[in-house]
Swiss-Prot record:
GO BP terms, alphabetized: DNA recombination; double-strand break repair
Alphabetical keyword list: DNA damage, DNA recombination, DNA repair
Record GO cellular component, one term: bacterial nucleoid
PANTHER family for the chain: DNA REPAIR PROTEIN RECO
Family: Belongs to the RecO family.
Species this chain originates from: Saccharopolyspora erythraea (strain ATCC 11635 / DSM 40517 / JCM 4748 / NBRC 13426 / NCIMB 8594 / NRRL 2338)
Gene name per UniProt: recO
Coiled-coil boundaries: none
Pfam family membership, one: RecO_C
Keyword Lipid biosynthesis among record annotations: no
Record protein name field: DNA repair protein RecO
Function, in words: Involved in DNA repair and RecF pathway recombination.
Family annotation (InterPro entries): ARFGAP/RecO (IPR037278), DNA_rep/recomb_RecO_N (IPR022572), NA-bd_OB-fold (IPR012340), RecO (IPR003717), RecO_C (IPR042242)
Length: 273
């Protein structure tokens, strides 16, 4: 059996038998890994709370036939301690973990950029220096960029004509010019697409200057764009405390075609039964 060590973020936990858990990790060098933490549900477990969702850990594992096994854990950052007592930050962090879990689909495939995005978002949420909705939206935009789904913001998604453009269409891929604008496109306020650009590129001065209505509208566009590409909504995203936004009708139609279902009560940061 070969031993290996890496830093990781705990994405999800699942009961296994009477005392064990399967821990889903996003590691720095090996991508997503599912491993068993033996005896972790016992009060005498040496792992304690170090393998709970939101934990950033240094972990040693040995390779098993089906699942790897966790042998040592050391806490690097206890992000959860600064997140779980704030509902908005907690639900935002749940959305971060669920997004990562969905995008890192293949186990054992390195996804360093996604790992850095996840740890950066959790660190920002735990630090409480920035608005949690802005942190989440910045993460979602950058995660979509990692996946190759970033919305066009400064040029037309169809003809590449330079903007600014007044319309946005998720099926087309983002901002669209007047000539290419499909039916059903939305017309966000003039400040909304610049806000999304600022979040994507880390211009926090511009992002934090945005008004509340602009932030809410931007959140709606980001969520709709993400849902279109993932083909079903994140379970945790409806729980994030933000004003309601209307899902474009084309998204509803796509969901109906796929027979998509959503469970707004379930949380990726909880323990699967």
């Amino acid at each position: 059996m070969s031993l290996y060590r890496d830093s990781a973020v705990v994405l999800r936990v699942q009961k296994l038998g009477e005392a064990d858990r399967i821990i889903t990790l996003l590691t720095r060098r090996y991508g997503k890994v599912r491993a068993v933490a033996k005896g972790v549900r016992r009060t005498t477990s040496r792992f304690g709370a170090r393998v709970e969702p939101f934990c950033h850990i240094d972990v040693q594992l040995y390779t098993g036939r089906t699942l790897d096994v966790i042998t040592q854990v050391q806490t690097l950052d206890a992000f959860g301690a600064h997140i779980v007592d704030d509902y908005q930050r907690y639900t935002s962090a749940c959305a971060v973990l669920e997004t990562v879990d969905r995008l890192a689909a293949e186990e054992g495939e390195p996804v360093l950029r996604l790992y850095l995005l996840a740890t950066g978002a959790l660190r920002a949420l735990a630090g409480r220096e920035r608005d949690s909705s802005l942190v989440l939206d910045a993460f979602l935009l950058r995660a979509m960029s990692f996946a190759g789904w970033a919305p066009a913001l400064d040029e037309c998604a169809r003809c590449n004509a330079r903007g600014p453009h007044a319309a946005f269409n998720v099926a087309a891929g983002g901002a669209v010019c007047a000539e290419c604008r499909p039916a059903g496109s939305v017309r966000p306020s003039a400040a909304t697409l610049p806000l999304l650009e600022a979040l994507l590129h880390g211009d926090w001065a511009v992002a934090e200057a945005a008004t509340t209505p602009v932030r809410r509208e931007g959140s709606g566009l980001i969520a709709a764009h993400l849902q279109w590409h993932m083909e079903r909504q994140l379970r945790s995203l409806p729980l994030v405390e933000r004003s309601e936004w209307k899902v474009p009708e084309i998204i509803r139609e796509r969901a109906a075609e796929l027979g998509a279902t959503q469970d707004p009560v379930a949380s990726p940061a909880g323990e699967d039964g």
